[in-house]
Amino acid sequence: HQNSSIAHHRTVGKVQLLEDRMIAEKPKSKLGIAHTRWATHGEPSEANAHPHKSKEAVYIVHNGIIENYVELRESLINDGYDFTSQTDSELIAHMLDYFIKQDNSMIEAMYLAKEKLNGAYAIAAIDLNNNSNVVVARNKSPLLLGLGTDEIFAASDPLAIAQLTNDFIFLEDGDVASISAEEYKIYDASKSKVSRDITHIDISNQATSKGEFRHHMEKEIYEQPEAVL
């Protein structure tokens, strides 16, 4: 929100349910994170849905699997953190909060967390106490930036934001980026600020639409013969 608070909404089921809730509240903000979850750790439930939060201050969304989440979870519990979900993702929020409380910035906290995390992940995080940007990180899981007009996006796939922009920056493994509506900064695995190429991709509306099919999986099945050719 513009009043330095975070509107936190989660639903189970169709994305339309979340859209309806957001439309009803009409939150005013210049930044946000969102996520559609394929359940790997924990059942499909509102408690297991993203974004996950820590201490009402750090909020994250995460794609991928944290392989050493059991030991990291136990360590954070010993440090006084309470878990409210069954997911491996929630520990990322607590870990970032832990490092931020040691006088690290969100970017510094993300690098410290990366040293602890084993597995594949694409992460986007917001710190309520420094909510001018979103910090993202990639390791073995797709993550890209989308450059719009007075707006910048992060996503796992170009199709997710194809209706908003055709200009993309594909982040590399180890990259951490800070993004706001006005600018983006990318840092590599060695914490050096770097420049990544901008790729222009024209994606048709047909590629993002379900068309006559009931869902995207059905569409992909019927498109396989053409894809193979």
Give, region by region, the residue ranges found by the protein language model:
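Conserved short alpha-helical segments that host acidic/polar catalytic motifs at enzyme active sites
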Residues: 1-216, 223-229
